[in-house]
Amino acid sequence: GKPFRQAKMAISGAAGEGKYWCSLGAVLDANQDTPVNSGGGEGGMPPADWDVVYRRDPIGVVGLISAWNYPLNVAFRKVAPALIAGNCAILKPSEIAGLSCMFIAKLAHDAGIPPGVFNIVTGDRDAGAALALSPSVSMISFTGSSLTGSRIMEACAPKLSQVALELGGKSAMVIFDDVDLDMAVATTMKGFLTNGGQICTAHTRLVVQAGIQDELLKKLKVELERLPYAEDPITEKDRGDRAWEEGKSDVVQPVVCKSQQQKILSFIDAARESGIEVLTGGGVPDVTNPSGYFVEPTVLNNVPRDS
C-alpha cells in the first residue's frame, strides 16, 4: 500500500538520519568526562571544592515499537540513536510492515554489531505488551495510536521505566473566507492523498468558516470524484500507475492491508448510522484489476466537534 516514490525516499531518509545520529554520537563521546565548572551555579551548586564531570551513561535495554505507515524511517529513527548511545535495542515492528525492519537487522549484522546488541521481535500487540511489561526493559519508545500509547505508559509506570511516545491524531486545516478556494482544495487534496492518506500530517479534518463551506465542499467533491485509482505499479499501464511510481498526489493509493480497509469502512458506517452526511465516497471503488485495498475518497459533512 505504500507509493513507490515514498518507499524510495524512505531509504535515503533513513540513511540521512543515520548520519545525523552518528554525528551526535561523536559529540556525546567528545563531551564525556569533561569538567563542569564548580561554584558558579545557582545557590553555589555544585560547591567549589567538588570535582564534577559531565557523563551520560546508556539506559540499558530499550524496547522500540514502530509504526506501519513509515516502517523503515520510524524504526531507524529509534534504532540508530539507541545503539549510538550504547544501549541494547529490541525492535518490535508492526506485524503488517516488518520486512524493511528485517533489512535493518541485516545491515546491523553486516556492520559487525555484536549478537544480542540489536534484536528484532515480531508479532502483534501481545509482543509489544511483553516488551512494555518486561522488568529487563528500561525504556520503551512507541509510535502509534494514542490509545495504545496510554496503555504502554500505564504498563511502564509501576516499574518507573522511561517512555517516549509519538502518538497519532487528526491533523486539521483551518480555512477562512479570504482564502483562494482553488488553492485550498488543492492543498487539502495533497495532504489527504500523500502516502495514501496514511500519515500523521494528512489533512483529514477541515475547519471551515461557515460562509464558504458549501462552495469549498462543492469544489472538493468534484475534484475527489474524478481522481484515478492506482493500478499495478510494475506494469505502469496508465496514468494511475505512472502517478504511483512518481509519487504524485493526484491519484488514490490503496490502504496498507485488508484489516485497515475494513476498519476505515466501519468508521464511515458508524458515521452514517449517527446521522452524519457522507458527501461523497464512503465505500470500496469499482476498479478494474485492483492492486490493493482501496477506499473511496470520502468527505463527511457537519461532523460534531465532540466526535
Predicted regions and their residues:
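Alpha-helix boundary recognition
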Residues: 9-12, 19, 122, 132-133, ...
